[in-house]
């Protein structure tokens, strides 16, 4: 796959003339600090915090993209903007050429904290999403979709269980099924495996790889894990530290699919990619720590 980079834009592409599915244009996000009553009396203005700045990115259809960077660099802020859950201070995003500024069924979101309705069963959590997006759909068709995605994520037999009866891995599988059941154009995943133990995390990574092979949705994954990004991604977006975090570099991951984690380090270029990511994260993290010491 080709990687085109210039000052204005970073384009992830295998064919340069193919239209991007997701486009981010000059995205910045500024948060206003709180102003105390004393500051108001003294007529002090609140301080601004620039979380991300000057983000330009285009992603082609059916592409798995991971975003990685030091803690606090605005990865989740960027994902929330793509999801329509937060508005950029400058710039805009578009999907298939249409500017979007709110959540929509074209983007399914999987959260780290699961975000399941505790009073609903597994099937009801998924069905609620389908009913919300497709209110006029026949009941039988809704139920068929729910069962299809329960099967896809390997939860047959758990349809009537409530979230408190599920392990963390099972809850996350419900979240993935719920996001996919509305048939989005892309899946947005905010550190979905961060709270899981190593064995469960590895199992779900393999499940996501399998599901991606079957569904071929575009995926944007936020992660702290170099190995996870290399296992799952077609491209890896590396961000600088905040404030005013930017895209530092985009790495193309040329490994064949389907991938086997036990063979990952044998792929040509694996060690070079891993070393580049380790060097970037080490440099950015060290700079963050040094800036904290100086304060």
Question: Over which residues does each language-model region extend?
Answer:
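The feature captures the beta-strand-to-loop junction immediately N-terminal to the Walker
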Residues: 68-70
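Helix-to-loop junction immediately C-terminal to a conserved catalytic motif
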Residues: 83
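Conserved ABC transporter NBD signature motif
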Residues: 91-103
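Short coil-to-helix segment of the ABC ATPase nucleotide-binding domain corresponding to the Q-loop/switch region
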Residues: 120-129
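Conserved ABC ATPase "signature" region
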Residues: 138-158, 210
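Conserved ABC ATPase signature
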Residues: 162-166, 170
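A short, proline-enriched helix->beta-strand linker immediately N-terminal to the Walker B motif
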Residues: 181-185
């Amino acid at each position: 796959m080709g990687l085109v980079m210039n000052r204005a834009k970073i384009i992830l592409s295998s064919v340069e003339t193919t239209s991007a599915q997701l486009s981010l244009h000059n995205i910045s996000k500024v948060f206003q600090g709180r102003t105390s009553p004393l500051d108001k009396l003294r007529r002090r203005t609140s301080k601004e915090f620039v979380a991300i700045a000057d983000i330009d990115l285009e992603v082609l259809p059916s592409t798995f993209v991971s975003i990685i960077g030091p803690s606090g660099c605005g990865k989740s802020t960027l994902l929330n903007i793509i999801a329509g859950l937060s508005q950029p201070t400058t710039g805009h995003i578009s999907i298939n050429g249409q500017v979007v500024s709110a959540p929509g069924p074209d983007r399914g979101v999987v959260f780290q904290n699961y975000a399941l309705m505790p009073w609903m069963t597994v099937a009801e959590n998924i069905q609620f999403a389908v009913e919300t997006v497709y209110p006029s759909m026949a009941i039988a068709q809704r139920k068929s979709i729910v069962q299809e995605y329960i099967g896809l994520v390997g939860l047959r037999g758990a349809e009537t269980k409530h979230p408190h009866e599920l392990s963390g891995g099972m809850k996350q599988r419900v979240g993935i099924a719920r996001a996919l059941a509305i048939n989005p154009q892309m899946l947005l995943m905010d550190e979905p495996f961060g709270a899981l133990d190593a064995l469960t995390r590895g199992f779900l990574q393999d499940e996501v790889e399998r599901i991606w092979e079957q569904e071929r949705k575009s995926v944007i994954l936020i992660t702290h894990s170099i190995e996870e990004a290399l296992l799952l991604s077609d491209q890896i977006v590396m961000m600088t530290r905040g404030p005013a975090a930017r895209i530092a570099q985009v790495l193309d991951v040329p490994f064949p699919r389907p991938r086997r984690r036990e063979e990952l380090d044998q792929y040509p270029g694996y060690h070079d990619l891993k070393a580049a990511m380790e060097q970037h994260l080490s440099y950015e993290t060290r700079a963050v720590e040094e800036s904290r010491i100086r304060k």
